[in-house]
Amino acid sequence: MTDVRLTSLTKTYPGEAGAALDALTLDIPSGSLTALLGPSGCGKTTAMKMIAGLLSPSAGDVTFDGQSVLNDPPEARGAVMVFQNHLLFPHLSVADNVGFGLRMRGRPKAEVRDRVAEILGRVRLPDLGPRMPSELSGGQQQRVALARALVLRPKVLLLDEPLSNLDAHLRLEMR
């Protein structure tokens, strides 16, 4: 796990009045569960994208364990983001979607297969590996997206409304 610190994190866009995120300062201790709460448009997703390296801040800093990560590419940060709208590859099976990041990192096929099977079991989808995303419910697709993030064993896991498509029972189980 990793200590995350946001210092005066700000994001402005040219031609827009005000900041999308204005001087957010936050310490997130290693191993903790932290929720960013607020109304739509207040900058929660913007902050997470900057932590993950998917968006550059206009000002401020993001540090992991005391080291700035602003110049690190997203894949080198060890932060993974799960988006509300899944972003699954429609032409890949569930198993291939979950194992995609491992394959891109050059992991051996046997390791990819074993870790994908393990994580699909953890998100309660052990038999859906051969299926295509279009054959899944919204809640199942959300769990595949979560599995795709978890299989990488990230230092920082960022979840943008990850439980929104799950029924009440599954929501409790996935927590």
Which functions belong to the PLM regions below?
Residues 37-39:
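The feature captures the beta-strand-to-loop junction immediately N-terminal to the Walker
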Residues 45-48, 144:
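ABC ATPase nucleotide-binding domain helices that frame the ATP-binding cleft
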Residues 52:
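Helix-to-loop junction immediately C-terminal to a conserved catalytic motif
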Residues 58-61, 111:
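Conserved coupling/switch loops of ABC nucleotide-binding domains, chiefly the family-specific signature
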Residues 60-68:
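Conserved ABC transporter NBD signature motif
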Residues 78-79, 88-175:
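ABC ATPase nucleotide-binding domains
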